[in-house]
């Protein structure tokens, strides 16, 4: 058998390429990287395949938030057709240096719900990403509404108990919100998804790493057998 490397490609899924090192990240108490975040958001996109839901990859959300050229940003945003979306899922990272790939120390989640014309920020660590979330909100808002969308911090967001599970909380929260929406959440527009997140996420994060790892191994096995 040949030698293996952490950089070995193990799976191509949609537009995401996972490497062997990503399995180690999921196995251990380690901060989730962009690839793992993008992979699971892409998987959720296939599960919740409605054209009115858009789960934005971390790299795209980061670029939108930090693009210095407003005219270029307008051209960049056109193919995303965000005005046609009822639910928009945006990962937030506190990296402010566009020259540093996969920088940053914390993940959180920004959600836009068209029915309420509201952006909601879910932060699992005492709201430390508030500034980054508001920056992303200001950048995206003109492309989903007439600039009159509101911004809300969800203070009931379940909180992490360590320094490395923020990405897991992001993904768990995104999953619960997508499930809420797909199960007819629009009918409960006054309550939104807050109760679902508060009740479901704390348990979900306890086994989500293992669940994602099992999913990757299943997809790897299926790709080999094709």
From Swiss-Prot:
GO biological process assignments: proteolysis
GO molecular function, one term: cysteine-type peptidase activity
Pfam name, any one: Peptidase_C48
Stored SUPFAM superfamilies: Cysteine proteinases
Documented EC number(s): 3.4.22.-
Cited InterPro entries: Nep1/2-like, Papain-like_cys_pep_sf, Peptidase_C48_C
Enzyme class: hydrolase
Residues forming coiled coils: none
UniProt KW keywords: Hydrolase, Protease, Thiol protease, Ubl conjugation pathway
General function of this protein: Processes the pre-form of the ubiquitin-like protein NEDD8/RUB1. Has the capacity to discriminate between NEDD8/RUB1 and ubiquitin. Has no SUMO protease activity.
Family: Belongs to the peptidase C48 family.
Protein name in UniProt: NEDD8-specific protease 1
Species name: Arabidopsis thaliana
């Amino acid at each position: 058998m040949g030698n293996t490397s952490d950089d070995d490609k193990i799976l191509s899924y949609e537009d995401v390429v996972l490497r062997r090192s990503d399995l180690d990240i999921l196995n251990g108490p380690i901060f989730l990287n962009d690839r793992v975040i993008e992979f699971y958001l892409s998987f959720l996109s296939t599960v919740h395949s409605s054209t009115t839901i858009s789960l934005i990859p971390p790299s795209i959300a980061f670029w939108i938030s930090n693009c210095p050229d407003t005219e270029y940003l307008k051209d960049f945003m056109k193919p995303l057709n965000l005005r046609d979306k009822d639910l928009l899922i945006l990962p937030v990272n506190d990296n402010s240096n566009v020259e540093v790939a996969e920088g940053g120390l914390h993940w959180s989640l920004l959600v836009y719900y068209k029915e309420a014309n509201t952006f909601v920020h879910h932060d699992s660590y005492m709201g430390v990403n508030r500034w980054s979330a508001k920056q992303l909100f200001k950048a995206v808002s003109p492309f989903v509404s007439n600039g009159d969308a509101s911004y809300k911090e969800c203070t009931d967001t379940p909180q992490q108990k360590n320094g490395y599970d923020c990405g897991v909380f992001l993904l768990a929260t995104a999953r619960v919100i997508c499930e809420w929406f797909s199960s007819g959440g629009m009918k409960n527009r006054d309550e939104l998804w807050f109760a679902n997140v508060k009740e479901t996420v704390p348990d979900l994060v306890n086994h989500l790493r293992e669940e994602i790892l099992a999913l990757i191994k299943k997809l790897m096995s299926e790709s080999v057998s094709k």
